[in-house]
Protein backbone atom coordinates (compact mmCIF):
# COMPACT_ATOMS: atom_id res chain seq x y z
CA UNK A 1 0.00 0.00 0.00
CA UNK A 2 1.40 3.40 -0.99
CA UNK A 3 1.41 6.36 1.36
CA UNK A 4 -1.46 8.04 -0.49
CA UNK A 5 -3.50 4.83 -0.48
CA UNK A 6 -2.83 4.32 3.23
CA UNK A 7 -4.10 7.77 4.19
CA UNK A 8 -7.13 7.42 1.93
CA UNK A 9 -8.07 4.14 3.62
CA UNK A 10 -7.26 5.15 7.19
CA UNK A 11 -9.99 4.53 9.75
CA UNK A 12 -10.62 6.91 12.63
CA UNK A 13 -11.86 5.48 15.92
CA UNK A 14 -13.79 8.25 17.68
CA UNK A 15 -14.53 8.05 21.41
CA UNK A 16 -18.12 8.72 22.48
CA UNK A 17 -18.68 10.81 25.60
CA UNK A 18 -20.55 13.81 27.00
CA UNK A 19 -19.88 15.82 23.83
CA UNK A 20 -21.54 13.18 21.63
CA UNK A 21 -24.44 12.59 24.03
CA UNK A 22 -25.88 15.51 22.11
CA UNK A 23 -27.65 13.46 19.44
CA UNK A 24 -27.28 16.18 16.79
CA UNK A 25 -23.51 16.15 17.30
CA UNK A 26 -23.44 12.36 17.04
CA UNK A 27 -25.45 12.43 13.81
CA UNK A 28 -23.09 15.05 12.37
CA UNK A 29 -20.16 12.78 13.19
CA UNK A 30 -21.85 9.82 11.55
CA UNK A 31 -22.65 11.69 8.36
CA UNK A 32 -19.15 13.15 8.21
CA UNK A 33 -17.78 9.66 8.78
CA UNK A 34 -16.19 9.55 12.23
CA UNK A 35 -14.25 6.60 10.82
CA UNK A 36 -14.93 6.44 7.13
CA UNK A 37 -13.01 3.94 5.01
CA UNK A 38 -13.90 5.34 1.65
CA UNK A 39 -14.09 1.90 0.03
CA UNK A 40 -16.93 0.53 2.17
CA UNK A 41 -18.05 3.25 4.59
CA UNK A 42 -17.08 1.73 7.92
CA UNK A 43 -17.51 3.77 11.12
CA UNK A 44 -16.00 2.84 14.50
CA UNK A 45 -17.03 4.27 17.87
CA UNK A 46 -14.99 3.77 21.05
CA UNK A 47 -17.16 3.43 24.15
CA UNK A 48 -15.83 3.28 27.72
CA UNK A 49 -17.39 0.68 30.02
CA UNK A 50 -15.82 2.56 32.94
CA UNK A 51 -18.12 5.53 32.23
CA UNK A 52 -20.86 3.34 33.73
CA UNK A 53 -22.75 0.39 32.26
CA UNK A 54 -26.02 2.25 31.80
CA UNK A 55 -24.25 5.19 30.17
CA UNK A 56 -22.16 2.95 27.90
CA UNK A 57 -25.16 0.85 26.88
CA UNK A 58 -27.23 3.92 26.03
CA UNK A 59 -24.42 5.39 23.91
CA UNK A 60 -24.06 2.11 22.02
CA UNK A 61 -27.80 1.77 21.46
CA UNK A 62 -28.16 5.32 20.13
CA UNK A 63 -25.07 4.99 17.94
CA UNK A 64 -26.34 1.74 16.43
CA UNK A 65 -29.86 3.10 16.03
CA UNK A 66 -28.72 6.26 14.24
CA UNK A 67 -26.35 4.24 12.05
CA UNK A 68 -29.11 1.83 11.06
CA UNK A 69 -31.42 4.71 10.13
CA UNK A 70 -28.77 5.95 7.69
CA UNK A 71 -27.85 2.50 6.38
CA UNK A 72 -24.29 2.84 7.70
CA UNK A 73 -22.17 -0.18 8.52
CA UNK A 74 -20.77 0.57 12.00
CA UNK A 75 -18.54 -1.03 14.60
CA UNK A 76 -18.15 -0.68 18.35
CA UNK A 77 -14.74 -0.60 20.03
CA UNK A 78 -15.24 -1.30 23.73
CA UNK A 79 -12.61 -0.08 26.19
CA UNK A 80 -12.30 0.55 29.92
CA UNK A 81 -10.20 2.46 32.42
CA UNK A 82 -11.53 0.19 35.17
CA UNK A 83 -9.98 -2.88 36.81
CA UNK A 84 -12.94 -5.28 37.19
CA UNK A 85 -12.26 -7.52 34.20
CA UNK A 86 -15.00 -10.05 35.02
CA UNK A 87 -17.68 -7.36 34.92
CA UNK A 88 -16.14 -5.82 31.81
CA UNK A 89 -16.04 -9.15 29.98
CA UNK A 90 -19.65 -9.92 30.93
CA UNK A 91 -20.75 -6.55 29.56
CA UNK A 92 -18.78 -7.12 26.37
CA UNK A 93 -20.47 -10.46 25.77
CA UNK A 94 -23.83 -8.79 26.33
CA UNK A 95 -23.41 -5.96 23.81
CA UNK A 96 -21.06 -7.82 21.41
CA UNK A 97 -18.62 -5.15 20.18
CA UNK A 98 -16.37 -5.79 17.20
CA UNK A 99 -13.27 -5.07 19.31
CA UNK A 100 -12.56 -5.22 23.05
CA UNK A 101 -9.46 -3.55 24.44
CA UNK A 102 -7.54 -4.72 27.51
CA UNK A 103 -4.64 -2.95 29.21
CA UNK A 104 -1.27 -4.63 28.91
CA UNK A 105 -0.94 -4.44 32.71
CA UNK A 106 -3.31 -7.43 32.92
CA UNK A 107 -0.32 -9.60 32.03
CA UNK A 108 0.49 -12.08 29.28
CA UNK A 109 -1.31 -15.04 30.89
CA UNK A 110 -4.52 -13.00 30.90
CA UNK A 111 -4.26 -12.34 27.17
CA UNK A 112 -3.61 -16.01 26.49
CA UNK A 113 -6.94 -16.98 28.06
CA UNK A 114 -9.27 -14.03 27.54
CA UNK A 115 -10.40 -15.01 24.03
CA UNK A 116 -11.89 -18.20 25.45
CA UNK A 117 -14.18 -16.03 27.60
CA UNK A 118 -15.40 -13.84 24.74
CA UNK A 119 -17.93 -14.32 21.98
CA UNK A 120 -16.53 -15.77 18.76
CA UNK A 121 -16.94 -12.51 16.84
CA UNK A 122 -15.16 -10.27 19.36
CA UNK A 123 -11.60 -9.29 18.44
CA UNK A 124 -9.10 -8.48 21.20
CA UNK A 125 -6.83 -5.44 21.46
CA UNK A 126 -3.87 -4.85 23.77
CA UNK A 127 -3.65 -1.27 25.04
CA UNK A 128 -0.03 -0.09 25.24
CA UNK A 129 0.00 3.08 27.31
CA UNK A 130 2.61 5.83 27.45
CA UNK A 131 5.65 4.70 29.43
CA UNK A 132 5.17 0.97 28.79
CA UNK A 133 8.36 -0.98 28.12
CA UNK A 134 8.57 -2.20 24.52
CA UNK A 135 10.85 -5.15 25.27
CA UNK A 136 8.23 -7.90 25.37
CA UNK A 137 5.49 -6.40 23.23
CA UNK A 138 5.79 -9.11 20.58
CA UNK A 139 4.50 -11.71 23.05
CA UNK A 140 1.32 -9.66 23.53
CA UNK A 141 0.94 -8.92 19.82
CA UNK A 142 0.90 -12.65 19.12
CA UNK A 143 -2.17 -13.07 21.34
CA UNK A 144 -4.21 -10.14 19.98
CA UNK A 145 -5.94 -8.97 16.82
CA UNK A 146 -5.22 -5.27 17.44
CA UNK A 147 -2.82 -3.10 19.44
CA UNK A 148 -3.67 0.41 20.68
CA UNK A 149 -0.35 2.25 20.65
CA UNK A 150 -0.20 5.26 22.99
CA UNK A 151 3.60 5.61 22.92
CA UNK A 152 5.69 8.60 21.85
CA UNK A 153 6.30 8.81 18.10
CA UNK A 154 10.08 8.52 18.57
CA UNK A 155 9.68 5.22 20.43
CA UNK A 156 7.23 3.98 17.80
CA UNK A 157 9.84 4.68 15.13
CA UNK A 158 13.01 3.62 16.94
CA UNK A 159 11.56 0.38 18.31
CA UNK A 160 9.77 -0.51 15.06
CA UNK A 161 6.45 -0.95 16.87
CA UNK A 162 4.26 -0.96 13.75
CA UNK A 163 6.37 -3.57 11.96
CA UNK A 164 6.54 -5.77 15.05
CA UNK A 165 2.79 -5.61 15.55
CA UNK A 166 1.95 -6.37 11.92
CA UNK A 167 4.52 -9.17 11.75
CA UNK A 168 2.49 -10.87 14.48
CA UNK A 169 -0.82 -10.41 12.59
CA UNK A 170 -1.85 -7.73 15.08
CA UNK A 171 -3.19 -4.54 13.47
CA UNK A 172 -1.73 -1.43 15.21
CA UNK A 173 -3.88 1.59 16.08
CA UNK A 174 -2.30 5.02 16.56
CA UNK A 175 -3.56 7.34 19.30
CA UNK A 176 -3.55 10.85 17.84
CA UNK A 177 -3.17 13.56 20.48
CA UNK A 178 -4.53 16.96 19.44
CA UNK A 179 -4.95 19.05 22.61
CA UNK A 180 -5.62 22.23 20.62
CA UNK A 181 -8.97 20.72 19.55
CA UNK A 182 -10.06 20.86 23.18
CA UNK A 183 -10.18 24.65 22.77
CA UNK A 184 -10.64 25.35 19.07
CA UNK A 185 -11.68 23.87 15.73
CA UNK A 186 -8.27 23.57 14.08
CA UNK A 187 -5.31 21.50 15.20
CA UNK A 188 -1.85 23.08 15.34
CA UNK A 189 0.79 22.77 12.64
CA UNK A 190 2.95 20.80 15.07
CA UNK A 191 0.13 18.33 15.73
CA UNK A 192 -0.47 17.88 12.01
CA UNK A 193 3.23 17.25 11.43
CA UNK A 194 3.44 14.76 14.30
CA UNK A 195 0.40 12.80 13.13
CA UNK A 196 1.44 12.83 9.47
CA UNK A 197 4.96 11.71 10.33
CA UNK A 198 3.71 8.88 12.54
CA UNK A 199 1.21 7.68 9.93
CA UNK A 200 4.14 7.14 7.59
CA UNK A 201 5.18 4.35 9.95
CA UNK A 202 2.30 2.33 8.48
CA UNK A 203 -0.73 2.85 10.73
CA UNK A 204 -4.07 2.25 9.02
CA UNK A 205 -6.20 3.04 12.08
CA UNK A 206 -6.19 6.27 14.10
CA UNK A 207 -7.92 6.84 17.44
CA UNK A 208 -9.23 10.03 19.04
CA UNK A 209 -9.98 10.10 22.76
CA UNK A 210 -10.75 13.37 24.57
CA UNK A 211 -11.06 15.37 21.35
CA UNK A 212 -14.37 13.72 20.43
CA UNK A 213 -15.64 12.60 23.83
CA UNK A 214 -15.17 15.88 25.73
CA UNK A 215 -14.07 18.46 23.16
CA UNK A 216 -16.28 21.43 22.21
CA UNK A 217 -16.12 20.48 18.52
CA UNK A 218 -16.48 16.69 18.52
CA UNK A 219 -17.69 16.28 14.94
CA UNK A 220 -15.18 18.83 13.65
CA UNK A 221 -12.36 16.81 15.25
Regions found by a protein language model. Name each.
Residues 1-221:
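Non-catalytic helical/linker scaffolds that mediate oligomerization, partner binding
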Amino acid sequence: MTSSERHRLSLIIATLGPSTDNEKELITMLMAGIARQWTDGVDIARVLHSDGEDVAKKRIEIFREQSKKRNLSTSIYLDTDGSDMDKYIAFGNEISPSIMSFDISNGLDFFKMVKSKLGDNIKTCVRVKHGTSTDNLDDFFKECDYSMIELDSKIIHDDKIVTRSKDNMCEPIYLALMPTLMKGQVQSREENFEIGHTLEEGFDLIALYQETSHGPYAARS
